[in-house]
Amino acid sequence: MSGNAIALACRKLRDKALRIAGEALEADPRDLDITDGVVHVRGNPEAAIPLRTVAVLSNPLRYAFDEEAKRATQFAVAKPMDDPPVAPGEEPGLEGRDYYSPPRSTFAAGMHAAIVDVDPDTAEVRVLKYAVVHDCGRLINPRIVEGQIHGGVAQGIGGALYERMVYDGAGQLLNASFMDFLMPYATEIPHIETDHLETPSPLNPLGIKGAGEAGVIPVSAVIAAAIEDAEGIRIDAMPISPDEIFRLRLRAAAGDAEPLNRARGSVPS
């Protein structure tokens, strides 16, 4: 939501900057481009004005600045000293304002896959490989999206195998410090393979969807499914620890555990 509001406000800001620069350069704003902080006439880079000067030109107090600013901000067309070059009804200053309210929510889509190893003796679980294919619409900043996915998967692995809040009968939290609250080490997070699809959303100007929770939400279910495939027993609660897996093995051997209806040897999920 905020990204689309920013985009709409920036478009207004750009239009305003081009109008002001067009008056200073005696050019049609439709013939102007902004490149590396400079407004220039398309096809004539010599006819240009820095964007910072455009910002000063839009300020009604521009003539209160120093002599250099005064020289840099003189219009080709004379104007009153207190009349900034903005369109009628616009506020002075190089600013843009807009509002955005989505017609309805957008939803990201994706697929997670994991390969795990469960030690036959200790029941320790190691995540060997993890892969994510994700579609959050148009990628505005691919590196940030990549970081969101990687960080989310790491958080999800912690929630699936390590992090657990333990309370006593009076409701007192017993593991309230990092001394006894388990979290995964970096060495316990596997290499995460990622790929991205871009299916723009038709519901907003930027065509974007969400990426914040897409890395973390599926992880527990995926790892549980992989453990089920390895052990052949139903996993119905997470996080899961080696001693819980060991007890499930004993229950399965005694015929007390819920059998898994999936054929053994299938590809881990």
Name each region found by the language model.
Residues M1-S269:
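C-terminal catalytic domains of large/alpha subunits in multi-subunit enzymes
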